[in-house]
Amino acid sequence: MGVQTCAVAGRGVVAYLLAMTAAQNDRSASTPSVASAHDKILIVDFGSQVTQLIARRVREDGVYCEIVPFNKAEEAFKEMKPKAVILSGGPESVHEAGSPRAPQLIFASGVPVMGICYGQMTMAAQLGGEVEGGHHREFGRADVEVKAQSKLFEDVWSSGSKNQVWMSHGDRITKMPPGFSVAGTSPNAPFAIIQDEKRKYYGLMFHPEVVHTPDGAKLIRNFVRKIAGLTGDWTMRAFREEEIAKIRAQVGKGKVICGLSGGVDSAVAAVLIHEAIGDQLTCVFVDHGLMRLNEAEQVVDLFRHHYNIPLVHVDASKQFLGELEGVTDPETKRKTIGRLFIEVFEAEAKKIGGADFLAQGTLYPDVIESVSFTGGPSVTIKSHHNVGGLPERMNMKLVEPLRELFKDEVRKLGRELGLPEIFVGRHPFPGPGLAIRCPGDITSDKLDILRKADAVYIDQIRKHGLYDDIWQAFAVLLPVKTVGVMGDGRTYDYVVGLRAVTSTDGMTADFYQFDMKFLGETATRIINEVKGVNRVVYDVTSKPPGTIEWE
């Protein structure tokens, strides 16, 4: 999946450019995984846009897994010694010259293997089957009919049943490899599911990892638990203990600086590091004046007074707003904010002095996306707008305690660490903050209006018990004014747009279908309680074609 350039809070204030340097890659490779003592599954990535969903499904079942590009899979297999392997889908055709293959070492090892889409095709071709390309393509929903019993289907699908799945393939198998049999068919795929239960090989032409295959997560669970025999010992409690030991070993008696954004990633990283090394950690919170109502005060109170973590609070709001005056282009806003953040953060770090390490809230998707499945820098990467090359500029080593976690796992870890739910469960917030929720030029007055309108909107959502049902909700102050009537007088005030979406990963999203009574009540409250607003509209655009944020 791609990475939005507005993801500072989601990735941690000091997340670096995703295209990591060779030196950083060398450092990562030499650092033992905290999962070294756990059962592991290796996921070989052939370039599917949903490979990360496979990993999330496996992790949800309590089993640690890692994603590696196909051309690094042999090395990873030898190092990890996984108990099972999953071959992902991908955009290539098995018939194309130079198309990727799984290492033969995997098939010679005796571990269970599940091939998904392209993974099924290359498994069949490599094990002696035949595959043809370009005919009878299937994309979208399809029904698979179960033709034989399988451990993969236990307590999920019964023989003869038809079940909805999500197809996305061009190639198809025409002759099975020796030892395989048909377990399921679809109208355009007579070998939709194949298996060799003796060797524990399973091939699926559909994608079990996506929500459009309703029983897909159960099929993956059966592969993980019943076929591979893994028990699920990957927990946030275990991760917490192991990562604390790892941080202590890495840092020793050194000093660490961590940037706080108010987002969950940087908050969890800071609390975990502080638990490991205490006051060797100093946090720097740069308030750019673009945060939500009372958010800066909440961050300072939590870390300085609740956790007693050394915190430098820098109110740079005048500097940021001064530089943003008259700026209307969204990308220029981002770059301006990013440049200023680097300048302010670097200046404060120099004042602290003597720091050996820079802590970052890098997540596992950042690590995955730093390299494409072909092994080079991913062409889909967009630069984070915040710190760029801070680690290199400041000659500091990196501490990245969350680099093996997905976002939902970070939230679980936050709860394990005892962070308040208002921090752990809050909706994603863009790094440029309200700057990209205020299209057009930015002023202090506009930001005050937007903060208050957003606070009323979120308060309404919480009061109606809807907050946890929504992926992200926020208000936007539109750069237009409209005529209204309040009392006996004419008004000419701003329009507020309301946005709320449901999503599983932020890559696609549907607008949340509020009850009209709720929208009416919310609009009335905003107009009555927020001076400068006389009209409220609701955004019913899905993603795609729109994006979640307006800028």
Swiss-Prot record:
Keywords for the protein's UniProt record, in alphabetical order: ATP-binding, Glutamine amidotransferase, GMP biosynthesis, Ligase, Nucleotide-binding, Purine biosynthesis
Limits of the GMPS ATP-PPase domain: 234-426
MF terms in GO: ATP binding; GMP synthase activity
CDD domains xrefs: GATase1_GMP_Synthase, GMP_synthase_C
Binding-site positions, ATP: S261, G262, G263, V264, D265, S266, A267
EC number: 6.3.5.2
Residue ranges of every copy of the Glutamine amidotransferase type-1 domain listed in the record: 40-233
Active site: C117, H207, E209
Gene3D superfamilies in UniProt: 3.30.300.10, 3.40.50.880, HUPs
Matching InterPro entries: Class_I_gatase-like, GATASE, GMP_synth_C, GMP_synth_GATase, GMP_synthase, GMPS_ATP_PPase_dom, NAD/GMP_synthase, Rossmann-like_a/b/a_fold
Keyword Cell division included in the entry's annotation: no
GO biological process, one term: GMP biosynthetic process
GO cellular component: cytosol
Pathway it works in: Purine metabolism; GMP biosynthesis; GMP from XMP (L-Gln route): step 1/1
Reaction catalysis annotation: XMP + L-glutamine + ATP + H2O = GMP + L-glutamate + AMP + diphosphate + 2 H(+)
Subunit composition and interactions: Homodimer.
Function: Catalyzes the synthesis of GMP from XMP.
Full protein name: GMP synthase [glutamine-hydrolyzing]
Organism: Bradyrhizobium diazoefficiens (strain JCM 10833 / BCRC 13528 / IAM 13628 / NBRC 14792 / USDA 110)
Lineage: Bacteria, Pseudomonadati, Pseudomonadota, Alphaproteobacteria, Hyphomicrobiales
